[in-house]
């Protein structure tokens, strides 16, 4: 008898949740006015530009893998977005360095300390043609993709 009551309660809760979620889904449809985001706003939000992105510190400083950082990721501006043509991609044309205070924890968990770490941020972005590279060219550049963290650069990064 108790099992039957519990089962009935369970079904009532499920039915209540289903009705509530159905109401939430149809609430927007009952309105006579549908909110539509204008094309210019959609285009502006999605077009190639610097956008904030969480970046893991160890992705930027792979040689520091033996340490723990807090926070483990930082918010940086990076070029992202659409270019409106499949032959183009969004790349940085101007970058700047930003230095942040990060908590660094040694592998043996000895006293941790604050360090200043420099990261590259994208300031200006542009849609540029995608360069087709041959396999031989890719092999030559392999391992040379990381740039120096302490120098400012005006060059686009891959």
UniProtKB/Swiss-Prot annotation:
Gene Ontology MF term list: growth factor activity
GO biological process: angiogenesis; branching involved in ureteric bud morphogenesis; cell differentiation; gene expression; glycogen metabolic process; placenta development; positive regulation of cell division; positive regulation of cell population proliferation
Ranges that cross the membrane: none
A cellular component term, taken from the record's GO annotations: membrane
Compartments it resides in: Secreted
InterPro entries in alphabetical order: Cystine-knot_cytokine (IPR029034), PD_growth_factor_CS (IPR023581), PDGF/VEGF_dom (IPR000072), PDGF/VEGF_growth_factor (IPR050507)
Cited SMART domains: PDGF (SM00141)
Record's keyword terms, sorted: Angiogenesis, Developmental protein, Differentiation, Disulfide bond, Glycoprotein, Growth factor, Mitogen, Secreted, Signal
Positions annotated as glycosylated: 29-30, 97
Gene3D superfamilies for this protein: Cystine-knot cytokines
Ranges of biased composition (kind: Basic residues): 137-149
SUPFAM superfamilies: Cystine-knot cytokines
Signal peptide: 1-18
Annotated S-S bridges: 48-90, 79-125, 83-127
Record region (Disordered): 136-158
CDD domains: PDGF
Family named by the database record: Belongs to the PDGF/VEGF growth factor family.
Function: Growth factor active in angiogenesis and endothelial cell growth, stimulating their proliferation and migration. It binds to the receptor FLT1/VEGFR-1. Also promotes cell tumor growth.
Subunit structure of this chain's protein: Antiparallel homodimer; disulfide-linked. Also found as heterodimer with VEGFA/VEGF.
Protein's name according to its UniProt entry: Placenta growth factor
Lineage: Eukaryota, Metazoa, Chordata, Craniata, Vertebrata
